[in-house]
């Protein structure tokens, strides 16, 4: 796992992400790139996969229209998807990739997808977080 962890750290630094926290033993990074809307993105290096999770908002009052809109938007997301956490109240962006052949382009594509999603869908996200 040390090799994968080091590779991921190299990708993050090469893409100018700010590493807030890292724990090699647990395989966890917490990163941000606020100019792209990414804050407290959790990246888990868990051989054989890497997991990206970005908290988006909390659903205060579950609403059919919110869930419908999120599922419809999932179809447009290039990499990753909206998911709910175990409580069913927190909306998270999540993506997973295989570590074995992970390259910088794949890694960056997930981060670009998240950034694009946050910029294109920000008005909806803000509105949903008010419910």
Q: Language-model segments: which ranges?
A:
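Short, highly charged C-terminal tails/helix-capping segments
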Residues: 126-131
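Charge-rich, low-complexity N-terminal segments
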Residues: 1-38, 76, 83-85
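A short, solvent-exposed beta-edge/loop patch
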Residues: 83-113
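Beta-strand-connecting loop/turn residues
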Residues: 25-27, 48, 89
